[in-house]
Amino acid sequence: MNIEIIYRARVRSRDNLVKSMKNMASLLDLRVGFWEQGMRIVLCPGGYMDFGWQKEKGLLGQWRLTGGCDTTPLGAGFHKAVVEMLDLLGKKDLRELEVRDDTGYWEDRDFERLQKEHFYPWLTREVDDILNQLEDNACLQRYWMEDQYQPQEIPGTLITPMGRFSKKWLQERQGDRLEEIAHRFFLWEQPGDNALCFRNCALKRMWEDCYYATSARSKEDAQTNRYIINALEEASELDPSLPLPLEDYRLLCRLDGREPFIPDTAPQMVEEFAIGYRKEEVMQPFDALRVPLPGIYRYEWSPVGQGGGSGTWWDEDSDSPVWRFSGCRNPHGAAEWNNDLDGMQDVEEREFSGARAHWGWSEVKRRRKKDQDDPLWQVVCEVAAEDTLYLVSVLYSRPEERQDIYDRLRRMELGKRLVEG
């Protein structure tokens, strides 16, 4: 059973609350997002507080706020940070604040008891459950968002946003060495701003979010690289004895074009596996379709019409193939191929998980004379799966890339549909 904090309150003016939250976010260096039905306060990577709001009836009706957050598996330090944020909001903006905290920390503020009586027992049960499920010939995921990419599977390992762990590593630390697991599992285990929290925030971004691409490639790459570098340097300053992932730190400094600040004499953190799921191939989802692509490929959505559009994956830093995905649903029944691929070469067909796919390649005709010295080729693929027809087109500039593209299409999978309707 996860550890949660539930809260509710009232405010007289939603607009004043939004204005106040924007000012507070700027002062405290927090991220706050707003939408029609509520707001979200982000306290750390993957750690946030959600609030929904609703106007009460009557001319003088106030706004009722309700919300909650799951503080596992982020850790007792995150739980404390949520309580302190509620304290701040209760003094500043919220009226009639009510908090339900089953750990009792809201009332007694005993951090040691919170950690020893609630988070460590939760972690003990969690590790026991993981080891009961984790088989030597299979891979297990925990706390992983279903609608994002799927990391490469390694038998006998656990995939989490905080890193990959082997069954043996967990077994060796089960019981008396549980604290070692806590230091790596919990992103924010200890109270306040501390070196371990900064390091683990960096590790989470390195494992799950970082493309290991140059900061010049995109704004997203620059923000991710610099967040990691700054967090590791903060950790080093707060506790020079804390082991850090120095090899990856220096690599990210090179990708960001800056000189390393952490000295070479700093202790090196030892990991079982190379940090960064995106350093390897990953399974990228487009609705129910899953295609194995290089982890460095970045995704962009291009809207078309009302609610339609296409998704594109590629690496802007290199002359990589450009993968473009789109899809349409048949409201009257099963989807069928639209294209017989006439004029395509090396046409292949494949059936998998109830889906039917076919693809082939052709040279792209260049209209402008100046482009004709730089030939392009294209692989076109259709996948009919239940009521949906997926179109995959791959543009590439080197003939030798065709075999790799075909190999990836042969390894496509069909999973659960991510968007219903």
Residues covered by each model-derived region:
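Hydrophobic beta-strand residues in large extracellular and virion-surface proteins
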Residues: 5-7, 21, 291, 323-325, ...
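Short, conserved charged micro-motifs
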Residues: 11-21, 331-339, 402-403
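Secretory pathway targeting signatures of secreted, lumenal, and periplasmic proteins
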Residues: 285-340
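Signature of long, low-cysteine stretches enriched in small and polar/charged residues
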Residues: 338-396, 400, 420-421
